[in-house]
Every structure is written in C-alpha cells, then in structure tokens.
C-alpha cells in the first residue's frame, strides 16, 4: 500500500502490475534519452557560433528525424499493446465476483455461491480503531484466494464510479446498464487498498475498497462462515 511521502508506485502484487511497472520504466528511459538529446542540441545552438547560411536542405538529417521517431513510437506501442491484450485476456477464472457501485458504497456478490453477498461501507473516522487508516477502512472486506484467477464483473446502479486497486494494476469503470469485467491474481497474501477513481458525486472520496487476499484454505473457511 502507499505510505507518506511516497515518490514511486505501490509495490506490485500481481503479474499485470509487474508488467505495467516494467513498461513505465521502459518508457521513462526513452523519455530521458530524448530529453537529454534535445537539451544537448539546444546547448550546442546557444554556445556555437558556426552556422550554415548556404544550406537549403539536408536530406540525410530529414530522413533520420523521420525514421527515428517512427522507431521510437514502435518501441513504445508494441509492449503497450501486449499489456493491453494481457489485461483483457480471461482464461478459466476460478472465482467470479460481481461488484456494484452505489451512492456511496460498494456491494459484492460471489456468484459461484448460492447466497454470499454483502455491502461494503467506509468506516467513519470517529469509529476507527488504533492503527486503522482514515478514509480507507471498510466494514466488510472482499476476501479472495491468492494465486488464483478471479474475474470481477463491475457495474453500477446510479452514479459512475470506478473500481481501482493500484497495487494490483486494476481500474475499471462502473457504468449503469453495462457490465465491465477484469481479472486479478495476487502473488502474495495481504490487505490491498483502493478507492473510487472517478469523480462520481459528492461522496466520491468516501468509497474505499479493501481486498484481503488469503490462501485457499482460509478463503474456504471464510466463505463457509458467511453462508
């Protein structure tokens, strides 16, 4: 999860987020190299007194600055498209959870179980226990098995929120009348916090998301206790 004065991303806990972090570093290196080259050329232009007053065109230079940007764009586009297809790919999910956005809370339904559903409200600041996080804790956490593919079906009843958990690389809009889907898989257990990431109304800031990823045997015990 995030911590005060954090400068980078949250620690990745899913294969998709790992890929996104690698892509970010890859793109940032390209931006750094281009910026360094531009600054170097500007410094040369400001410091040198040599000019080519008789030069009308330079086909070699024009060819280079046409081909080089195209190569750079391809180097950015190919890994980006690969990650986009990975995020859309859903292969035999082990569990399906339906998420509905409301004013101003989330409700969850485990569709593989006959009667396992609940609402998840933010815990008010006045009711927080020592060590709990302001504006991030909920009364009912979403418990999921780790190291298993989970499909999330996301929609809304009224407003237009967005269901997002940064450390898992998830952000999916919840739209009334439309069912969006995404997948998640955690490589380690823990609590993972998210929030509504679309300004959906007056209490947009009070729609936190808490996922509790646990080993399968603990998930089975939890699901049995909830039925």
UniProtKB/Swiss-Prot annotation:
Enzyme Commission identifier(s): 7.1.1.9
Cofactor(s) for this UniProt protein: Cu cation
Name recorded for this polypeptide: Cytochrome c oxidase subunit 2
Underlying gene: MT-CO2
Subcellular location: Mitochondrion inner membrane
Family under the similarity heading: Belongs to the cytochrome c oxidase subunit 2 family.
Subunit structure as annotated in this protein's UniProt entry: Component of the cytochrome c oxidase (complex IV, CIV), a multisubunit enzyme composed of 14 subunits. The complex is composed of a catalytic core of 3 subunits MT-CO1, MT-CO2 and MT-CO3, encoded in the mitochondrial DNA, and 11 supernumerary subunits COX4I, COX5A, COX5B, COX6A, COX6B, COX6C, COX7A, COX7B, COX7C, COX8 and NDUFA4, which are encoded in the nuclear genome.
Chief location category: mitochondrion
NCBIfam families: CoxB
Major enzyme class: translocase
A molecular function GO annotation: copper ion binding
Catalytic function, reaction form: 4 Fe(II)-[cytochrome c] + O2 + 8 H(+)(in) = 4 Fe(III)-[cytochrome c] + 2 H2O + 4 H(+)(out)
Gene3D superfamilies named in the record: 1.10.287.90, Cupredoxins - blue copper proteins
Entry note: cofactor: Binds a dinuclear copper A center per subunit.
Stretches assigned to the Mitochondrial intermembrane side: 1-14, 88-227
Bilayer topology term: Multi-pass membrane protein
Residues binding Cu cation A2: 196, 198, 200, 204
Binding-site residues for Mg(2+), renumbered to this chain: 198
SUPFAM superfamilies in alphabetical order: Cupredoxins, Cytochrome c oxidase subunit II-like, transmembrane region
A GO BP entry: ATP synthesis coupled electron transport
Transmembrane segments: 15-45, 60-87
GO cellular component assignments: mitochondrial inner membrane; respiratory chain complex IV
Function: Component of the cytochrome c oxidase, the last enzyme in the mitochondrial electron transport chain which drives oxidative phosphorylation. The respiratory chain contains 3 multisubunit complexes succinate dehydrogenase (complex II, CII), ubiquinol-cytochrome c oxidoreductase (cytochrome b-c1 complex, complex III, CIII) and cytochrome c oxidase (complex IV, CIV), that cooperate to transfer electrons derived from NADH and succinate to molecular oxygen, creating an electrochemical gradient over the inner membrane that drives transmembrane transport and the ATP synthase.
Mitochondrial matrix compartment residues: 46-59
Keyword field: Copper, Electron transport, Magnesium, Membrane, Metal-binding, Mitochondrion, Mitochondrion inner membrane, Phosphoprotein, Respiratory chain, Translocase, Transmembrane, Transmembrane helix, Transport
Pfam families named in the record: COX2 (PF00116), COX2_TM (PF02790)
Residues that hold Cu cation A1 according to the record: 196, 200, 207
């Amino acid at each position: 999860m995030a911590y005060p004065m954090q400068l980078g991303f949250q620690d990745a806990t899913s294969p998709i987020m790992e890929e996104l972090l690698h892509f970010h570093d890859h793109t940032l290196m390209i931006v750094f190299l281009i910026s360094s080259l531009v600054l170097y050329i500007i410094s040369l232009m400001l410091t040198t007194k040599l000019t080519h007053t008789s030069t009308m065109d330079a086909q070699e230079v024009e060819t280079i600055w046409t081909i080089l940007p195209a190569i750079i764009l391809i180097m950015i586009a190919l890994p980006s498209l690969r990650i986009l297809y990975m995020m859309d790919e859903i292969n035999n999910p082990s569990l399906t959870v339906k998420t509905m956005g409301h004013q101003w809370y989330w409700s969850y339904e485990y569709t593989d179980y006959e009667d396992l559903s609940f609402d998840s409200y933010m815990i008010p600041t006045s009711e927080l226990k020592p060590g709990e996080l302001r504006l991030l804790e909920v009364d009912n956490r979403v418990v999921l098995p780790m190291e298993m593919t989970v499909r999330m079906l996301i929609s809304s009843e009224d407003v237009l929120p967005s269901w997002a958990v940064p450390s898992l690389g998830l952000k999916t809009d919840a739209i009334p009348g439309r069912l969006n889907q995404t997948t998640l898989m955690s490589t380690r257990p823990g609590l993972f916090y998210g929030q509504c990431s679309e300004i959906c109304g007056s209490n947009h800031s009070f729609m936190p998301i808490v996922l509790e990823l646990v080993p399968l045997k603990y998930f089975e015990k939890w699901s049995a206790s909830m039925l």
